[in-house]
Amino acid sequence: FLIIHDKHAAVIDPGGDLTYTPLTLELMKYIRLQSLDYVIASHQDPDIIASMPRWLVHTNATVVASKLWARFLPHLTSAFMSDRIRSDFSDRLIELPDQGQNIPFGDTVIKAVPAHFLHSVGNFQFYDPISKILFSGDMGASMVDDAQSPVTDFDAHIPSMRGFHQRYMCSKKVMRLWANMVRDMDVDMIVPQHGKSFVGKAMINRFLDWIGNLPCGVDLLTQDDYDYAGLINSVKVD
């Protein structure tokens, strides 16, 4: 996702090497790469930020990520790419504290809001107070063919979301805490990294009501999921 405000620009969750070239070609239709202020990462997954070294080499952008990942992100950089980066990595990194913070963006801000354990232990979402869009990362993600259009039939959309959230999200408690936070925000659109967006207060509230009551992650685990004896008994040695 690309946010542009006056002469400022930020890209959110730009992905890995597979997406770097096509993404930069699209970005150059709207901005000069050298004018990019930020490369923002919701969490540490390869499909989120593995292309970081290339952004550091080819732009002057600052990387924004959770403080938990500050010591891990340099491991994405090969020795070859490290030699090409023009400055020390720590000088081009904003480490977000757990409670989040405002990221300066011209005469406004991008708000980093906490979304920890949804699914990463150091996870953030990003809110644009001008457009009132919440870029929600993996929260609200869906497995659909047509991701360009927003959700219009929420009940029909549930099957494309349920399995992903039950596997990747930590617990119903965390999702409910997150939903309560979003209800206190002035959000007109929730845009996940994958799948359809939720547009308008009514559709957003439908999603928040559903996600805040969905058992997932550790809620679904039993002792059968940690059955060492069953594993041993199932192993056959010829």
Where are these regions (language model features)?
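Short catalytic-loop micro-motif centered on adjacent basic/acidic residues
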Residues: 10-13, 37-41, 112
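Metallo-beta-lactamase
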Residues: 109, 116-192, 196-201, 214
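Short acidic-hydrophobic surface loop/beta-edge motif
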Residues: 3, 100-105
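C-terminal regulatory/interaction regions
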Residues: 200-238
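Active-site environment of divalent metal-dependent phosphoester hydrolases
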Residues: 19, 44-49, 70-73, 99-101, ...
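Conserved beta-strand hairpin/beta-sheet module of binuclear metal-dependent hydrolase folds
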Residues: 1-29, 125-128, 132-137
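Active-site HxH/HxHxD metal-binding segment of metal-dependent hydrolases
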Residues: 19, 27-99, 210-216
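Short Gly/Pro-enriched turn/cap motifs at secondary-structure boundaries
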Residues: 93-94, 114-117
